[in-house]
């Protein structure tokens, strides 16, 4: 018998939770995941991440406190999540992009993103649950020494053009910006409480704008 899922993926707090709670419930209870088609996301993120390894924080942004990018691309697993003083059956598990060690010993958690849209506060609001999930795992690590996370944020690259010659090579041009998300652990725990109640409860209704559920419904009606 397959082991029952006992972890929450940080990205699900940003995407699935907001898009369709029914799809989230199916994924966590029956291991049914909607097919994804974003072949460039992984490679682009890896290229972006590689540019900041072992760099001083001033290389990323003048807004960051003194420190250095000390870790990247590592899997992190939290201890069981505690909600309202009660230990749940769930933990956080995922792979972060960049971790900064600041001069004061605290950590910064940075997620790398490539976009074609505006780099603004809406991006911070959208990705904050994901950032807080990684921060929670670092502060409540199952296998590593737990450390305080004093900052989270997004390193955004916006693709805005291309250049090059046929006899040489082509490359995309980007502008870049660091967007600080700060910390909001209380809001994160409140959200996780809702997520756990959802996946441990009855199957919810489809999201109003869930393209996957609409596709399944239309297909089922035909065949």
Where are the model-predicted features located?
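Metal-dependent nuclease catalytic regions and adjoining charged, substrate-binding loops involved
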Residues: 2-10, 140-223
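Acidic active-site catalytic centers that drive phospho-/nucleotidyl reactions
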Residues: 97, 111, 130
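An active-site-proximal "capping" alpha-helix that borders the catalytic cofactor pocket
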Residues: 127-139
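Short beta-strand-loop-alpha-helix junction that forms the active-site gateway
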Residues: 112-122
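Short alpha-helix boundary/capping segments
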Residues: 122-129, 180
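Metal-dependent nuclease catalytic cores that hydrolyze phosphodiester bonds in DNA/RNA
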Residues: 1-106, 116
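Alpha-helical scaffold elements adjacent to nucleotide-binding pockets in ATP/GTP-utilizing enzyme cores
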Residues: 51, 130-133, 191
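Active-site-adjacent bridging/hinge elements
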Residues: 103-111, 187-189
